[in-house]
Amino acid sequence: MLMNVEEFADLFTTPLYFSLISGLILAAIALVRVNVVRRASIGWYVLQTFLGFMSRQGTNASAQTIPLFGDFKISGIQFAIWQITKVLLFGAFFANLMFGFSVVYLVDGNDLGIDSIPTIFSLPFVTPPTDHSYATEKVVPMIPALLVLVPPLLGAIGTRLLLYIGVHHVIKTVTAFLHDSTEGKPKYLSYVSTLEAVIGIGVLWAGFNMFFGNQIDYNTKYAIGGTLVVGLALIAFSFLDRMRSRILTHMLKRDVYIRIITIVVIALIVGIAMSVNNSVADAKKIEYLGPYNAQQIGVNRYLGELDQIEEHIHDVTLKSISPNNISGYIDENKDVLDGIRVWDWQAAFAKLKPEIGLIPYVTFEDNDILRFNDKLYWTASMAPILPSSVSLENRWYNEHLVYTHVPEGFLTLEATDGSIVDSSELFPQRKIYYGEGGLLDTTWSGYPTNREGSTAELNNESYSGMGGLDISPPISWMFEPNFMISYPGDSIHVMRYKDVNERMSTLYPYFLFNLFGKELDSLPVTDGKATYWLVPLIIGYDTSNIPWSVGNPYLRLAGYALVDTYNGNIQLIQHGDDFFTDMFMAQYQDKVIEMPEWLEKQIRYPQELFNWKTEMYNIYHVTDVDTFIQANEFYEIPRGLDTYYIEAKPPGFEEPEFVGLLSLELRGSQGRNLAGYMVVENDTPNLGKMQFYEVPIDSDTKLLGPTSVREALDRDPDFAQLKTLLRNPRIGDNILYRVGEHDTYFIPVYTAGAGGVVAQLGTIAAVGAAFTGEYYVGLGDTQESAFEAYLQKLSGVATTSSVTSGGVSMIMDKTAREDAIMSIFEEKEIKITTPTSIQIPLSFSIGDIAFYSKADLESTTELITKFIGEAGVGKRILMWEVDDTINFGYLKIVDNVTELHYIAIEVGK
């Protein structure tokens, strides 16, 4: 802790201060006794009883060993000191960071809606209107207090009741029974009256807590009323029995029956009333459930900020373009077509993985889709790991002093054309000392401060940043005992909390860095010099105490943090405008910066928050109570579909923008067509703005969903023919784009190379999303040619596999492929010789490739050109065929030994 204070100063102590405040307040509420006359203490009583028992082990008189708790009293000074001691001793168990934060905020004169809390006690007894304005007026103002103040207070008060009503009186009753039994005069009626009071107060407390439930309906008032009546009845019986216990020692059998029957009758009355209501509600759902469902809709629309989502009716049409205008139409929409995301992550990873080479000390940790200069890139970030070859005795040295960072932490691939990009062009600073996963997550690193140019770090790197702190003996010895022997008199520079999320959760524990069971995604961004992790600052609360929330969480984006990958410095950027953001800014205003201009073109709205809001919208977009109860217009995200971050131009956009896209289907629908799609903007000032494009249910033209569009592709005869020729084809992401007035899916089809490792683009399919009974699919080697083929089919120009691109058939039979190969040699004026057999003792492969479609022609040409260049002018080129592979080779004499150097081109059958 002392090291944290020295390294982070108030960034570390501020959350501790809030926790301390909350611990003191809540512990005082739960533990401090105020009855200075009685001055009872359970703890001291138990201690003295135990000591007395140990000193009297030889006697059998338990009543003498165990004193009456009712007579036990400590001195006034001891009582006062003990109350303070309890708070200090047990305050840590009651620490609640957000409660302490809120108390400080309130003390500073701010408001969290406490004045609205009394309204909650009337909600179960009032039938609200059938619109959600009631919840907006009554519930929303009190939500901040219900989130941060009420739950810890209820917990502290409940603990107090448990200790000083429950445990206190149970101990008092048990000790009284032991003493009375020893004297032969047990007062059973007195004991029963005490237990009745304890149980009655417990039941009343349970009834009180029911006001703070997350669901209220037409039966809630009966449940609360019945619970409170039972509690009051038990307390009344307790008073009655207390008075009668002065005369009687035992409870009469009649009195037992009266108490049991009373509770049973109350339960029956409440149960019958609730059952009758349920029976009536089965036939009158709108009248009974409608008002409460309306409030549920209102509260959850507030929780999900659904009123901020713009809704548009999407008019799906299928318009053919005149063949004469197709070329011009493509040129008009070139801004969209040029930005189509052709490469998905699986294909990108297959191309990037070989780039890591044989390096044994790094591994892929995460991937992100990023944008730079209005282009999309797949970026793979890496983490340092310990090579498996490191022996056990060298493990400590290598973990802490050698493998301290990733030398070149990013690999990048352009998401449209699939070309691997030199990451240093995007990230000038690629050394990752603070990042994600691997050794950064599990260990610290360090070096002696007097190393004077000599370094043990990887690649002879010598860290010169501001991250970490210097620790001198004996602190360094306590931190790591090995330093006592290795560097007994030297200061050590230690770098801790190198994992980004761990670092953030240590200094800013208010935020969620693990959401829905997954670690929050952080993005690498750069200002052109330094590289940062962009960490979303998402605040989240449990809504169990908010009426009509039905348990859906309260989530808000308060802003972002920029964490320097080299120095570990943290800068905060504000984005939210909710009550917590106001609280946070009041305490951390000096740590907040304006959003840098360079970040505006790299920032991204958190996918986790976008998905959650969309899930909330799937249900609570329905504001009509009748439709909500019928539950026939709820949406769902298609199975297996994730958010696509793309450059697109949805309807109403003047130019392509970087957006997140989620397609939605009608829940329970068998047609698997889209009910619409949700987009979220990532450009400032509209960062986080969501828009939903709804397809009317009664629309004559349907919008195909991901499942349906895959079926459309499989049914296309052109694709069926091409699929048989491709090597191990894999269908990539099917992403919906709006190109001009056409909703179109662009689906890449990948094929493995001859080695079966590196992904190659076999073809691109453009599938019309608008459906009136016939599918339209275009294939091409680029997104433009695929879209052109789609428009040609739509206009009736091309209906079969005659679709061409650049004059070459997209789907080529074996003869066409062989002719294309031979034409390459003919263009080079190379003559081919076909021997009857090949019998050369030594043969060497120059390369191999699969050639099935026009998409493979370019790479095939490159291989043949390379082969001709190595053979040289005048060499005789041999050709022979084995199965479905054509081989070309030439003879070369090395050290008087004839060698065959050849290439293999697989052309199929």
Residue ranges and their predicted role:
Residues 814-831, 861-863, 868:
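Amphipathic alpha-helical segments
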Residues 833-883, 887:
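BRCT (BRCA1 C-terminal) domain core and associated BRCT-interaction motifs
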Residues 491-494, 667, 810-816, 851, ...:
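Short, surface-exposed ligand-recognition loops at beta-strand->loop->(often short) alpha-helix junctions
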Residues 821, 838-840, 893:
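A compositionally biased, intrinsically disordered/low-complexity signal enriched
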Residues 2-805, 824, 862-865, 869, ...:
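Soluble extracytoplasmic regions of secretory-pathway and membrane proteins
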Residues 806-815, 843-846:
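DNA strand-break repair and replication-stress modules
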Residues 510-519, 827-839, 875-876:
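Short, well-structured beta-strand/strand-turn elements
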